[in-house]
Amino acid sequence: LGDMNFLGMQGNNGPIWALIALDCGDYELPDDANYIREMLVQSVLNMQLEDGGWAIAGDTADADMTGMALQSLAKYYLHEGETAAYAVDVNPAVDAALDLLSQMQFDDGSYGTFDGSGNIVPTSESISQVVTALCALGIDPETDERFIKNGCSAIDALMDYYVEGGGFRHLLDHDRDGMATEQGFYALVAYYRLLNGQTSLYDMTDVKLEGVKAEEPVDDTDKSDDTADTEVEDTSSG
């Protein structure tokens, strides 16, 4: 996790998901590695664009990447009355990103990403990433006015991509898609957890791990093969 050159091989995704992985449980870092967490946070902040967003590559903000970046920074965002536990102040960056996401939302409540021609196309995955990010920050994507356009929330937009019988589409005119289904359902799980006062999607500190003792293997190597020493009685007549 401390090798930023290695993490950077995946592009902007690397530090973002490394930070999410590090923070998903109560993991203790060695005393000489406490700098890693703040280094990852700072790395994510350093990738932020001037308009408040994050890009897959280049200098044009993308809703998916901005949503993912916010998911990684949510733990460090200070709500009113909270005390800072870490040295890095992420609030200005998060607030700027939220302002941008409000502006990026389409009139039907959806979000999009770039297609092969450089056009921004609404996709269910883009909506899913924004919904997951808002839930991680304690923001209700169904009721917060910043993320409602023409009476349509991000949740409304996501459900437009739902396929009857189970699953989600990538694009509105497509069939059921694996990645769209995965992200659509975990976005709804994130929203469910928010509504029920549970930890955010990637905060698994509420999971109790119980060790399971493996059964002792049965050693039958010393057993003799009785059949090998058994004489067979000839019962044939004649």
Where do the protein language model's features map onto the residues?
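C-terminal single-pass membrane-anchor helix
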Residues: 237-238
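Short glycine/proline-rich, acidic loop/turn segments that cap or connect secondary-structure elements
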Residues: 150-164
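Terminal, non-catalytic domain-edge segments
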Residues: 157, 169-225, 229, 234
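Alpha-helical scaffold repeats of the Armadillo/HEAT/TPR superfamily
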Residues: 35-40, 89-97, 148-154, 200-215
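An alpha-helical repeat/solenoid feature that recognizes helix-turn-helix modules
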Residues: 3-37, 47-95, 106-147, 163, ...
